[in-house]
Amino acid sequence: MGAIKGKPLMKPHREKNGIIICLNVGSSSLKFSIYRSDSGALGEIGSGTVDSDETGPARLSFDYFQGRKPSIKQRSVSGSAVAALRELAASEDQIIAVGHRLVHGGLTIRDHLKLSPDVIAALRRATPFAPLHLPPSLDLIDECLDSFPGIPQVGCLDTTFHKDLPPLAATLPLPKQIRDIGLRRFGFHGLSCESVLKQLEKQPVRRLVVAHLGGGSSVTAITNGHSVDTSMSLTPMGGAIMSHRPGDLDPGILFYLLREKYYDLDALEDLLEHQAGVAGVSQTNGDMRDLQNASDRGDAYAKLALDMFVRSIAKQIAGMCVVLGGIDLLVFTGGVGEHATAVRERIVQMIESSLGSPSQMVLPSQENERIAFHTLNLIES
């Protein structure tokens, strides 16, 4: 099957007015933002989360901040999270679209696009590439189709920003018959990288490195606004060490664990998705704040895990500087990149010892703003 392509990106038309809901689903929570389109201009009304567990009802928290006194609205969600969101958004204005962040589009979907039955079927086939992320996203899409009948649903991919990686970066070191299946470096956190460029549009940077550090972490090299290399590869498991994922790992380790029957395939996948990374090394939950606190208390495993994470990110940044032939700006973003000051400072110290002192910035990852933009663009085009 050939690639399923979306329409070329363009400036949104000035016609559709109303509410766009942007959704970013996790394993136990749903992050969302609500935007209003007014004559082509997008403004965020607010953002929030719906947290749920097996012990009680879900809880919706929504922070209003557009043109109002800041206020937080909280409520228990007796029905579904989507039903609560529909009620909340509809109280603001007519809902005109729902935008979904999708981690992976598989071998055939490269662009942001409207979610048709054929597209959703292709996304279901793509779940082996992102088994942690895509199934809950697809469940949410199904629920939104039921809850918002007739309302356009749009999928915004984390891989689209990297779709034109040069062959030197995109090509995997595998035989041609395997590459011809469509296996390549896809790259991730593309919406985050794009949001960084949007925030820098008044001060363009020629050689930019973006370090998106969070539960998943990646480092991307950008030349004149275009991705030229990135640390994650075919799936979001590769590259730097992460909270629960190992990053790049010698495949021989996996062969050994399978051949010696320490793990079957499903258990091995669970190991690499949930039990590895800094959580595995430190024997903690993988939260960077807890890891830092444990390290400060003298926990040797926590210190080792933190040291490994810092060095892994620093090595990725240094490698991207080689790709770019230097660096004009290093941007930290993502939850850890924005808020873990001590970790960020240690990474900078390590790269300064060999790269000098590159200019640095800390910027928020505004993925939902990009989802709103692309969603409006697609329903107008």
Can you annotate each of these PLM segments?
Residues 85-134, 151-154, 160-171:
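Short beta-strand-loop/turn "lid" adjacent to the catalytic site in phosphate-handling enzymes
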Residues 357-381:
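Glycine-rich phosphate-binding/hydrolytic loop that grips phosphoryl groups
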Residues 161-258:
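Glycine-rich phosphate-binding loop of actin/hexokinase-like ATP-binding domains
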Residues 250-253, 257-284:
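Oxyanion-binding "anion nests"
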Residues 328-350:
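Glycine-rich phosphate-binding loops at beta-strand->alpha-helix junctions
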Residues 270, 277-281, 288-323:
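Adenine-nucleotide phosphate-binding core of ATP-dependent small-molecule kinases
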Residues 25-76, 233:
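Short glycine-rich, Thr/Ser-proximal phosphate-binding strand/loop in the N-terminal lobe
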Residues 11-17, 135-148, 189-208:
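Conserved phosphate-binding catalytic cores of ATP/NTP-utilizing and phosphoryl-transfer enzymes
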